[in-house]
Amino acid sequence: RPQDNFYRYSNGGWIRKNPLKPAYSRFGTFDILQDTATSQIRHIVEELIAKPQTKGTNDYRVAVLYKQSLDSAERNRQGYKPLIPELQALQGIQTKDDLLKHIAQQDQVYGQGCLFGTGVAADEKNSTMNIFLFTQTSLGLGSRDYYVESTPEVKQILAGYEAYLVRILKLSGYSDAEASRIAKATIRIETELAQFSYSNTELRDSQKNYNIVTIADFARDNKGFDWSGYLRLRGLDVATANFMQLNFFKAF
């Protein structure tokens, strides 16, 4: 009945006739575009690997990467060994300076934002120029709600996340005690970050996410993190930036 569930009343027939495939949580125009693009890229890559490539060329690199990605037997043989240098680097962090250097290195070498993200985009109030951006981090569970809400369902999800972290850490060579300690510390840090993260509603507010500040002024007023030092370690000459989720960065 429309008074019970108007969405089902108006769309129910179409939904029943067009059930979602098990791999999809939704399926629309953009999903069709993505599937088409993925299929086309796969066709291009499979043509590459079917013939010899000259070592050092981009075609060669693509072919090698694709073959390595499919070689699950070799990945299983190596286990977590390729990650050992990264794990050792994390274990070597003792001071704020160590942490600063590690974050800058991860961003610069791998493009992997730690604690926060960075990028460049068009200035929303001056489309003739681009501007450097600082953005809040993506938490392990995605939404901040999983960390700040206290419903039974959320608590169950958080407990499952902790169990998952423990399992991954144990597979990476950590003892049961160490795995449990690191997993709890990870959730504690992510929960603290979530306290200052913008909600999904706030992230859609373009005005609230437009906070142009000079690096010098922001660094002077927010000394919990060496913002100027971070940019210097990355070799970036940035005078002004958009700290999109301003309260998140002030919390540092």
Which sequence ranges carry the predicted segments?
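Short intrinsically disordered, low-complexity coil segments enriched in acidic
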Residues: 1-2, 251
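Noncatalytic, helix-rich "gating/capping" subdomain that lines the substrate-entry/channel surface
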Residues: 47-252
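Active-site-surrounding "flap" and adjacent substrate/cofactor-binding loops of secreted or lumenal enzymes
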Residues: 2-4, 9-74
